[in-house]
Amino acid sequence: MKYQYITIEREFGSGGTRIGELLAKECKMPCYGREILECVARKYDISVEQIEQYEEGVTNSFLYTVFVMSKAQSGDMNMLSDEGKVYLAEQAAIQSLAQNGSAVFMGHCASEALKDRKGVVKVFIHANDAFKQKRIQEDYQISPNRMEFLRKKYDKKRANYYRANTMKRWDDYRNYDIVLNSGELGIEGCVKVLKSLLV
């Protein structure tokens, strides 16, 4: 294999999750997304829903980011907020799952967790509004107003979480090795491109 790991960050409605799942299936490797949260939930004996609430509570402030990173480097977890502890637990879970072999990782700043590993390709998937609206409508069967609300909510959540924990912009294409427009390439087209990196 040319690369062992693919980390995928994606815009809500771009089909990124579906692309990751199909890629993993075709390459016969695991795809970790919600599983990362489940690992943390088991460790702390809390629900996945609670973890998601902690993620939503993350601020994108510079001071928060510096604080979390300094505590992580010193190994001092006592002063960390619940949000900071969850982030570090997710990073540890990703690193642990990577030890099992080749995999696709969805979101959760996986590229940051695996930055010291070789064979990692960082991917960002985006699409035009029309494509995203169509996919969201098909997946959720909701009104256009609700659809736009959800799209903005989830993209903002992902951007804040990424920024707060990496000090980088989630949608800055310079943070990725490959950027794919699923609206132009299609779901299968994106899978084909990524598969060529693995086999």
Regions found by a protein language model. Give the residues of each.
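Short beta-strand-centered segment that lines the nucleotide-binding/catalytic pocket of NTP-utilizing
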Residues: 30-42
